[in-house]
Amino acid sequence: MAQGRSCVHPQCSTHSRLHWTQINGTRLVFSMNPAPRRAPIILYLHGGPGDACIPLTMRYNAALERDFRFINLDQRGSGLSYHPFAPDEAVTIDSMVEDVRQFVLGLLRGYGQDSLILIGHSWGSVLGLEMVKRYPSLVRCYIGLGQVVSMHAALRLRQNWAQQHLGPRIGSIVSGESGAADIVLMINELLSRGGAAMLFGSMGRIMAYLRSPYYNWPRLLNHAKGVSQSRARLDAELEQVDFSGQTSFGAPVYFISGRYDRHLPGSLVERFADGLKSPHRFIRFERSGHCPQWDEPERFAATVKAICL
């Protein structure tokens, strides 16, 4: 495991540094703050596929470092873990879940703990909920942000909404997983949440990458390549994901959904949560879109602390 330097930009209050580890034949980079050995561990799984976000959690979620060991893992082939996928390299949901499992086991061994807190956002919520399904003993609790429940159902709702409000042409664009769909939905979420003010606010997320001590232009290019290759390998499988038949989990699950989330409508998540027989809770953030952890970071930090401490 190797350390990098901490974020020194004046708008960053993070104490996290970069580390790396070797998992299943690939080098994975992650951020982690110094913390007491017995501090509760949070592992954050980014969205995408491939949309690594260490600069964003450093900028917006550093408040969690006061009470937790907060770790954000750049997944295989993504962000600072970028490498070109080999033609025969296994890049599937199963292989990505196995990467996460091996990473979790290493953390728990290293810090003498039995389980940790998982946070999964969007695509990362697929990996997170699969971890809870398959390995509940490793998960103290799970928090899903922009949770994937049934991609088929989400895409139908997304298309119907877009055709009604934006017209048939836009409806066809957002009916599948693609970069174009993400852009259309993101712009609409921003406008719905307050128009120009929110749009200018979103520039802060772009600046988080441009000002990060860990990103330069070649690494930004690699980030884009990581998104592209991850989508090419995983989007088709992602569109088949369906947790709607699951009625219980072996660890408590919490779902945070933004009122204006056009990517993965909260109505599906709330209905899914209502049908669970195991411990769960659905939480709606009224001022958020698809990224409640960055749209309302103060409320997000307070909510995580209330759930986990």
Regions flagged by a language model, labelled:
Residues 50-61:
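The serine-hydrolase catalytic nucleophile loop
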Residues 139-179:
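A catalytic-pocket lid/entrance helix-loop region that shapes and gates access to the active site
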Residues 163-251:
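Alpha/beta-hydrolase
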Residues 262-268:
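Conserved alpha/beta-hydrolase "acid-adjacent" motif
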Residues 288-297, 301:
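Catalytic histidine-centered segment of alpha/beta-hydrolase-like enzymes
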